[in-house]
């Protein structure tokens, strides 16, 4: 039976100093026989997805105390990718994932906490916390702040749903009036919570639920809804329960690595592919697998993408459905149930409640359940009032979306496509692979041939798009924006959104060793590996080269001879110390980013740091 980790600092006469300090934080002698549970929060006033988390940490702490534990809260950093987007701030987003994971390890191990409950929500915070949980492998429960309600606006007498991406598109398109652009901006993000589409934040929170590390409903239940309060209360109770079971009964089944097995990773990735979720999830799942020592690689994702159907399209892949609609249709479990009906899931998995997949589906699948509490939870919907305060409304949909033919979630027989919403491409441009969100690509663009127009920075590409230098038939190549080359692997939401605002999104492709926001749609191919800074062939592309993209065949190739490839490679190497670095880009790189670049791997390895010790 494992000893409580916290006993290192709370037991024995020699730890009088540590106990004195604990007592200064409010602990008493009676607390030293209780589990110390870290409340790992990520509250910040910078991020709408985290603006409401301060009081939620207090709520969870109070529940832990009532259940017989000692709660100790600390905060991680949290970057808002939307605010950091389109300027040098985006260089810091992905590296912050590693800092979050490291800072949690530092706090947990330095203070010998017994367990932790992670309160996350947005893009790099959830994966950073997941990496830490799998690294530390102590009892852990995840509960996120919840999705934002979609924005609503009346245009030409018709109410439409909007989100952050619409604000960017309307703001960049000179054909829209200032008044309309301002109205969109003011209505796009109406409440606290993670942006209302299936962007990276909501994708990761859904995958946390699919992995089994959070309670059912965690990925889709709105931040503003009163039902989400119960999710936090139940999570607080659960972390105390499983902590005691581990330390007092030697029950290891609730540890993160016991739950997030290879089979769980395959199920989570299957869910992601079936939704056409953010391509960033691939990056994060690969990184998490390495932390948890799980055998899960890019090749597994490639195989899954060829057999998992695309059963669900949510903004930005849909103009109709947002997270609130996904929840109404049964959410994560509703979609898993459709995959399970055609035997596309691994059933040998359990979740944080200790329930098997079959039991979870029987209880929480809205097409099967008789449980009135479950049915009531999935009726939770948006009220439509602006607020940054959680749990302020109790609106219920009048009915659930059980339409599996044309509804938000479709059955296998009514799939959008049968080869999934995400795909891995290989070729002489990307020998180790690259990623495309096929759910966001129009059918006419699944096979595309175009002429390269090459840029060595996102900023340079943005300028060219807005100055009408990018034309129909171009393949926009943005290189030296990978984990090492950026450094930091910037998201390319602005280039893809500007292409859309210029009505070029269906007539151009964009390829990069950088990555894309979950809000990206169109023929946007990222994570090209090896990246340019790691001697990848994307560094050898020149203006007007012909590039062939064939998504059905999973290929991406530069149409030049092998001799020409070798010649270009020779010329690049001749640049000496400057080889495989940008020739024309001027960018300040701080010491913090230089440190990240020194150890960063390419995207096919999850952009984790490779450290030899």
Swiss-Prot record:
PROSITE patterns: ILVD_EDD_1, ILVD_EDD_2. [2Fe-2S] cluster binds at residues 122, 195. Keywords: 2Fe-2S, Amino-acid biosynthesis, Branched-chain amino acid biosynthesis, Iron, Iron-sulfur, Lyase, Magnesium, Metal-binding. GO terms for molecular function: 2 iron, 2 sulfur cluster binding; dihydroxy-acid dehydratase activity; magnesium ion binding. GO terms for cellular component: cytosol. Pfam families: ILV_EDD_C, ILVD_EDD_N. Pathway: Amino-acid biosynthesis; L-isoleucine biosynthesis; L-isoleucine from 2-oxobutanoate: step 3/4; Amino-acid biosynthesis; L-valine biosynthesis; L-valine from pyruvate: step 3/4. It catalyses: (2R)-2,3-dihydroxy-3-methylbutanoate = 3-methyl-2-oxobutanoate + H2O; (2R,3R)-2,3-dihydroxy-3-methylpentanoate = (S)-3-methyl-2-oxopentanoate + H2O. Homodimer. This is Dihydroxy-acid dehydratase.
């Amino acid at each position: 039976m494992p000893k409580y980790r916290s006993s290192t600092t709370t037991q024995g006469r020699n730890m009088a100093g540590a106990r004195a300090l604990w007592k200064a934080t409010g602990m008493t002698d009676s607390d030293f026989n209780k589990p110390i549970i870290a409340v790992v929060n990520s509250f910040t006033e910078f991020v709408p997805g985290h603006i409401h988390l301060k009081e939620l940490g207090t709520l969870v702490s109070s529940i832990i105390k009532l259940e017989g534990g000692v709660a100790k809260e600390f905060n991680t950093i949290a970057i808002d990718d939307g605010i950091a987007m389109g300027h040098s701030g985006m260089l810091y987003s992905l590296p912050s994932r590693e800092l979050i994971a490291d800072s949690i390890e530092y706090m947990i191990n330095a203070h010998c906490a017994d367990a932790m409950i992670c309160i996350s929500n947005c893009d790099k915070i959830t994966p950073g916390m997941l990496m830490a949980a799998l690294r530390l492998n102590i009892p852990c429960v995840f509960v996120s702040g919840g999705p934002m309600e979609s924005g609503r606006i009346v245009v030409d007498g018709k109410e439409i749903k909007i989100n952050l991406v619409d604000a960017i598109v309307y703001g960049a398109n000179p054909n829209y009036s200032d008044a309309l652009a301002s109205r969109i901006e003011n209505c796009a993000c109406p409440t606290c919570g993670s942006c209302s589409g299936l962007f990276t934040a909501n994708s990761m929170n859904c995958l946390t639920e699919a992995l089994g590390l959070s309670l059912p409903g965690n990925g889709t239940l709105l931040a503003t809804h009163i039902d989400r309060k119960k999710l936090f209360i139940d999570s607080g109770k659960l972390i105390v329960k499983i902590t005691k079971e581990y330390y007092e009964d030697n029950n290891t089944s609730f540890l993160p690595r016991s739950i997030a097995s290879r089979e769980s990773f395959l199920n989570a990735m299957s869910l992601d592919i079936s939704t056409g979720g953010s391509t960033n999830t691939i990056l994060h799942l690969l990184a998490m697998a390495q932390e948890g020592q799980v055998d899960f690689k890019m090749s597994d994702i490639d195989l899954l993408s060829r057999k998992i159907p695309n059963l669900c399209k949510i903004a930005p892949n849909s103009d109709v459905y947002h997270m609130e609609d996904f929840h109404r249709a049964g959410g994560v479990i509703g979609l898993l149930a459709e995959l399970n009906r055609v035997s596309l899931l691994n059933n040998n998995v359990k979740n944080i409640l200790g329930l098997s997949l079959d039991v979870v589906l029987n209880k929480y699948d809205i097409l099967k359940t008789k449980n009135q509490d479950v049915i009531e939870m999935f009726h939770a919907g948006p009220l439509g009032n602006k607020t940054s305060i959680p749990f302020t409304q109790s609106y219920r949909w009048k009915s659930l979306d059980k339409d599996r033919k044309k509804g938000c979630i479709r059955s296998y027989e009514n799939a959008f496509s049968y080869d999934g919403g995400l795909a891995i491409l290989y070729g002489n441009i990307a020998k180790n692979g690259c990623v495309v969100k096929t759910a966001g690509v129009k059918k006419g663009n699944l096979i595309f041939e175009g002429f390269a127009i090459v840029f060595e920075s996102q900023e340079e590409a943005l300028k060219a798009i807005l100055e009408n230098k990018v034309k129909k038939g171009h393949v926009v190549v943005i290189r030296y924006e990978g984990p090492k080359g950026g450094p930091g692997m910037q998201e390319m939401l602005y280039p893809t959104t500007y292409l859309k605002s210029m009505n070029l999104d269906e007539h151009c492709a964009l390829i990069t060793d950088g990555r894309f926001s979950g809000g990206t749609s169109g023929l946007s191919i990222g994570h090209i590996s090896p990246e340019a800074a790691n001697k990848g062939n994307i560094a050898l592309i020149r203006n007007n080269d012909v590039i062939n993209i064939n998504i059905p065949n999973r290929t991406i190739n530069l149409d030049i001879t092998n001799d020409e490839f070798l010649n270009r490679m020779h010329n690049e190497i001749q640049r000496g110390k400057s080889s495989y670095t940008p020739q024309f880009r001027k960018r300040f790189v701080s010491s913090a980013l230089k440190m990240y670049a020194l150890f960063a791997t390419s995207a096919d390895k999850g952009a984790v740091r490779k450290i030899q010790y």
